[in-house]
């Protein structure tokens, strides 16, 4: 039986905060939003980036009422998402071209976020998000195993004299999570 939770947050800050908290506790977590939501989330995005918490943000780019325009298709959030937060951040961004690629690349977004312990932006637009598309039937690979990144088991943790969350044990600049 699948175990998951869907939560309707009261605002963008709560949404990203819950996603980061869920990820910090071992769940694969994401939040959907659009550009104005990314603006509001940027402080939490920086927190996830600097504390190395994997989280996926699905961004349906569009101009809209909060930007003073009627909703329309745009790719207007590229710079915002590439550098969201304060300080020297550079975020991983994925760009699906159609709903079939959204289906395939969403899995990759979670694998990348966990492998590199960082926020990943999944950049769609209003056209993909709202319009009808004709695509081939989607096929899920039942043999798929999530790439959870570098995680220590309870036995691994017991064998260590001391655990340091950000210690680079393998020299690849990626620390182990618990």
Spans of model-derived segments:
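Thiamine diphosphate
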Residues: 1-81, 93-113
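Flexible, low-complexity linker and terminal segments
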Residues: 105-178
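Short, flexible turn/loop "capping" segments at secondary-structure junctions
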Residues: 84-87
């Amino acid at each position: 039986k699948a175990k998951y939770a869907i939560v309707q947050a009261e605002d963008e800050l709560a949404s990203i905060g819950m996603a980061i908290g869920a990820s910090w506790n071992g769940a694969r977590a994401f939040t959907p939003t659009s550009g104005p939501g990314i603006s509001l989330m940027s402080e939490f995005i920086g927190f996830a980036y600097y504390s190395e918490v994997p989280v996926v943000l699905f961004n349906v780019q569009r101009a809209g009422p909060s930007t003073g325009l009627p909703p329309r298709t745009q790719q207007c959030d590229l710079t915002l998402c590439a550098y969201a937060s304060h300080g020297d951040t550079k975020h991983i961004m994925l760009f699906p071209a159609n709903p079939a690629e959204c289906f395939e690349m969403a899995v990759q977004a979670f694998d990348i976020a966990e492998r590199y312990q960082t926020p990943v932006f999944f950049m769609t637009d209003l056209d993909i998000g709202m319009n009808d598309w004709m695509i081939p039937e989607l096929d899920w690979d039942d043999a798929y195993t999530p790439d959870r990144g570098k995680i220590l088991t309870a036995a691994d943790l017991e064998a260590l004299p001391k655990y340091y969350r950000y210690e680079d044990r393998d020299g690849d600049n990626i620390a182990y999570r618990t």
